[in-house]
Amino acid sequence: MQRVNPTRMELLKLKNKIKLAEKGHKLLKQKRDALIMEFFQIIEQASDLRDKVEAKLAEAYKDLIMAQTVMGTLAVKEAALAAKNDKLEVDMDTKNIMGVTVPTFEIYNVRRKVGERGYSPYGVSSKLDEAAKKFEEALELITELAEIETSIKLLAEEIITTKRRVNALEYVIIPRLKSLKKYISMRLDEMERENFFRLKLIKSRIEKREAEGETV
C-alpha cells in the first residue's frame, strides 16, 4: 500500500484522479476500437490490391514470354536495357488516419507511349509493348500497395500501444487508486469514531468533575 495521508483533501484528490482516469480509459477504449475497425478495412484493401498486383504481373510476364518466343531472349533483353525511365519520380507526403501519421506515395511519369520507352518500335513484337504497359501499371499498383502496407504496420503499432495504455488503466492504475480511496475512507471513519469516543470520554470526565464539585 502506497503511503498516503488519510485526509479529506487527499480523498477528494483521489476521487478526481479516479474520475479522470476512468474518462481517459473510456476515450482510449473508443480510440482502440476505432483503430481496429480502420485496421481491418485497410487490411481488406491491401488484400484486394495485392491480388490486382499479382494478376497484373502474371499478365505482364505472360506477354513477355510470348515476346521472347517471337523476338528471342537477346532482343528482349536489349529492349529492356534501353527502356530505362529517367523521368520516374516518387513524391512522399503524410496523412492522418485516426490520429496516426502515415506516409503517402505519389508516382509520376510511369506510363509511357510506345515511342517513349527507349527502344525502337520497329521490328518489336506488340507483345513486348503490352508487357511494358502492364509492368508500368503494376508499378503504380505496387506503389499504392506500399503506402497501404506501411499504414497497416503503423496502425498495428498504435493499436498495440493503445491496448497497453487501456490495460494499464483498467488493471493497474484505476484499481490502485480505488484501493487507496477505500483505505483513506476507512481510516477517516476510524479517526472519526476515535474522536467521537475521545470526546465522549472527555465529556464524561467533565460531567463527573462537575458532579463531584456540586457534592463538595
UniProtKB/Swiss-Prot annotation:
The name under which this protein is listed is A-type ATP synthase subunit D
The record's section on InterPro entries has: V_ATPase_D (IPR002699)
- Where's it mainly located? membrane
Query: What does this chain do?
Result: Component of the A-type ATP synthase that produces ATP from ADP in the presence of a proton gradient across the membrane.
Query: What gene name is listed for this protein?
Result: atpD
**Cellular component per GO?**
plasma membrane; proton-transporting V-type ATPase complex
Q: Does the keyword Ligase apply?
A: no
Bilayer disposition of the protein: Peripheral membrane protein
Q: Name one GO molecular function term.
A: proton-transporting ATPase activity, rotational mechanism
Q: Tell me the domain comment.
A: Purified ATP synthase is 25.9 nm long. The hydrophilic A1 domain is 9.4 X 11.5 nm, the central stalk is 8.0 X 3.9 nm and the membrane-bound A0 domain is 6.4 X 10.6 nm; the domains are connected by two stalks. ATP is synthesized or hydrolyzed by the A1 domain while ion translocation occurs via the A0 domain.
What biological processes does GO assign it? Answer: proton motive force-driven plasma membrane ATP synthesis
Give the family this protein belongs to, as stated in its UniProt record.
Belongs to the V-ATPase D subunit family.
Give the source species. Methanocaldococcus jannaschii (strain ATCC 43067 / DSM 2661 / JAL-1 / JCM 10045 / NBRC 100440)
Which NCBIfam families does the protein's record reference?
Answer: PRK00373.1-4, V_ATPase_subD
Question: Which Gene3D superfamilies has this protein been placed in?
Answer: 1.10.287.3240
